């Protein structure tokens, strides 16, 4: 089954409100195997709403609308649906009585007795439409069959929309689809690999599954990491798990050391877990990341069992005074080099009495530094057996580079503790670590 999302409201077009409803609906529909082909935003105009509905019905089986069901003059979804279907509006007696009861129960209107005249618009329905109950607000939803398709309209208020979709819209969609209602996802989280490398490693498996159609693999890159999502549809969970198992095995084999966990894991949590298992501790020295690395580690409950603390040595002279980095080294190579990162790591390890010292230095931009291009990153990791480094060129703007730097640093610790290769990111590349 194919679905299109249609959001109504000038406020969405002007950027006053972000369309978070579309993201939420997309996830819910994907979970039950409904394919969302298009997501559209249209302004508060009856003709534009009607046209958007007609176009969507030409391409999809169901159209799911949000917004424009309020009581004011610019709430025009009801009129737009009626225009798309070529029908008029009718006042629904049951909805009118429900509206009066809702206002009375909420103590609104004239002393809780009279509904403002404008609100009665919410009791209007296109001819032939069915109302969808709203358990938390005054605006009922709309279910309208037009041709062979169905239009569902829900309020734009997220908590009202979420409840209505779960209680009324989704069950109706599943009845119409006549497809297995069980959809299971398996997520593999990766780090230390460019997104393109993850996709290339799984290209053969993706091609094989494309010919079969079930399960499916999707790549979700964000925050410097790539998630691999395997989705199977089946009659029950056990059957879906059986479909996923060989695909997961093939993916783990192809990605190797790049996989660090599943859906509920975080890279920082995995690193701290490895440290605790070894009765080891970690301290960090940060330049380019400016405290972000320590922040990620301390976001994990119980981090104090393995995390000693950190030093933000942002200025070059602080690298010497706080960490003991040799001033001659800083003069010769500057603050941004692999040798400086190694010295910072050794310094913070010694200063804070940790088993391992981790350091980051680089150029976040927007201007180059010491003739080093924006995106240059050097990481040092000092431990009982010596020091290792990782150097990489990261893409993006300043916030993105700093986020990626944190992920790359944590991944270096993970690989070292687990006895895994230092990864392809010891060389310059493009994409997300």
UniProtKB/Swiss-Prot annotation:
Name used for this protein in its record: CinA-like protein
Superkingdom to which the source organism belongs: Bacteria
Family note: Belongs to the CinA family.
Pfam families: CinA, CinA_KH, MoCF_biosynth
Gene3D superfamilies: 3.30.70.2860, CinA-like, MoaB/Mog-like domain
